[in-house]
């Protein structure tokens, strides 16, 4: 099984898979925190580090069987502002297509919660090569509006095959 872990942190996905006894052929990790990467390299020297989620190109990877990750959640969280995914111009982003359009036009985004759309972009791309890819998206309890947005985005991906 080939795994792609987005927002990998210190390799908790690799730890969980190991503890479950799941054999992993290749484990790709996208993470930008240098201390988390150092710890992961120490614990799992075989992990292939890809850098920022913004730079992940699945066409350059072996077929991915499992995508895991939890995008930053500060702007969804009850402990945060709960303002969700917005541009610096305060436009709320409700679809992957709109996110990709804004990104291509050079818009800037508030906080890091918009990176959910990068998870969805990558999942969409993986499904071109492996429509049966399994995925796990972990996130926080959030307000109803943003929970609907995330759920609808996932449903659209699943129903597009």
Describe the predicted segments one by one.
Residues 1-161:
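Conserved active-site and SAM-binding loop architecture
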């Amino acid at each position: 099984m080939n795994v792609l872990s987005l927002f990998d942190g210190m390799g908790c996905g690799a730890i969980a898979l190991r503890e479950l006894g799941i054999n992993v052929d290749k484990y790709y990790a996208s993470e930008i925190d240098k201390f988390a990467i150092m710890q992961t390299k120490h614990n799992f020297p075989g992990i292939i580090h890809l850098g920022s989620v913004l730079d992940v190109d699945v066409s350059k990877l072996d077929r991915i069987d499992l995508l895991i990750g939890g995008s930053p959640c500060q702007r969804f969280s009850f402990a945060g502002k709960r303002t969700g995914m917005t541009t610096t111009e305060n436009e709320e982003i409700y679809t992957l297509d709109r996110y990709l359009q804004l990104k291509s036009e050079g818009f800037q985004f508030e906080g890091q919660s918009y990176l959910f759309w990068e998870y969805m972009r990558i999942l969409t791309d993986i499904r071109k090569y492996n429509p049966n890819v399994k995925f796990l998206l972990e996130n926080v309890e959030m307000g109803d509006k943003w929970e609907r947005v995330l759920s609808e985005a996932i449903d659209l991906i699943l129903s597009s095959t």
